[in-house]
Structures are given as structure tokens and as C-alpha cells.
Amino acid sequence: MKNFLIILTFLFTFLAPATAASTKTVMVFGDSLSASHGMPIEAGWVALLTQRLQTKFTDYQIINASISGETTLGGRNRIKQSLETHRPEIVILELGANDGLRGATIKSIYENLATIIEICKKNNSQVLLVGMQLPPNYGRTYTRKFQAIFPQLAENYQIKLIPFLLAGFGEKHEFFQADGIHPNEVAQKKIVETVWEVLQTMIKTEKIAANPDN
């Protein structure tokens, strides 16, 4: 009996880490738009994306490292720790909206996001950058320059881009909560489709690269 327990302990010690290592991670690194603001966590697009991922790619999991109110500077300060903790293969980077709403300089937003991307790349994490837009009352020049940040970063760092997280409903009031800023539960289903379209392609490409002979 003692020998049997020793064998079981040996198997658990060496096989369990292998099983854990086979699970790959997608980390969502964002603000309140990704943190289920104003609704149950299970109703948010990240939870819906998790369900989709578990159905289509069972060897992947999602970690939501989003914080309501987060800025690009805040993300820059905590990205290293998040990468060390979760070791994601893919990072969905959804930051910048709060900076824009507060009128932060275009230069600071760009540089903070660029630093986050560079750190992710150094840690061998692919980046899926999520673009945002601002309401027109922030001025034509500022809103245009803000919107241009995301495609510029995607081109400069050769990373995947979702041009606008709220594509298809960004100007439709019925898809927003009472504050007029945060998407409601109905809109979450639209967001997950927007994200999934790009994410699934990244995962498929990664699988092909990992198993070129299959």
C-alpha cells in the first residue's frame, strides 16, 4: 500500500504540471469596458468570450485582468506583474478610453500603450490591440488623433487590431447604460462577436505554427 501511494504521488507530481502547462492563456487587460461595469460578471463580453473559447478551443482559458477606471499609465505600471502571474500566450489590450475622456495628451497615451506592447512582446505574448473612439464633443482634431493611435501602433509593432470595440452600435443610445458611456448587456453580445472574429484567427494561426506537420 505504501509503494502504491508513492507511485501515485510520483505521477501526480510529474503529470499535473504537464496538464497545467498544456492549457494556454488569453489575458484581457483593460478597463471598465472589459470589467462588466454595471452588470453581473457573467453578462459581460469577457465571460461570453470564455464560453465561446471553451466550446471551440478547449486547451485555452481566459484570465480577465481588467480594472474599472484603468488608464494606460496604470496598465503600464502593472503589466509586468500581470504577465509574470498569468504567463499569457495572447494579451487582449483594451486601454485608452479613460485617458481620452480625461483629455490626456496623445503622446502620453501612445507611449504608454507602446511600452505595454513592448513588454508583452519581450515576454513572448502576442498582442491583440483594441481600438476606441471618442464622442465628437471632444473636438475634431483631438478625436481624430486619438482614433489614429491604435492603427499606428498596430502597424508599427505588427500586431493584430480591432479598430473599434463598439463597432456597429457606438452611436446607438439603446445599446448603452444610463451613463451613456458603458455598453449594456445586449451590447455585450455584439462586442464578443467583434473580438471573436480576430481572436479565433490568432489562435488558429498559433496552432498551425505549433504543429506545422498536422
Predicted features, each with a name:
Residues 33-36, 40, 66-70, 98-100, ...:
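Short histidine/acidic/glycine/proline-rich micro-motifs that form metal-
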Residues 15-16, 44, 197:
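Residues in and immediately flanking transmembrane alpha helices
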Residues 1-4:
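Positively charged n-region of N-terminal signal peptides that target proteins for export
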Residues 19-68, 78-87:
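Serine-esterase "nucleophile elbow" of acetyl-processing enzymes
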Residues 6-14:
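Bacterial N-terminal signal peptides
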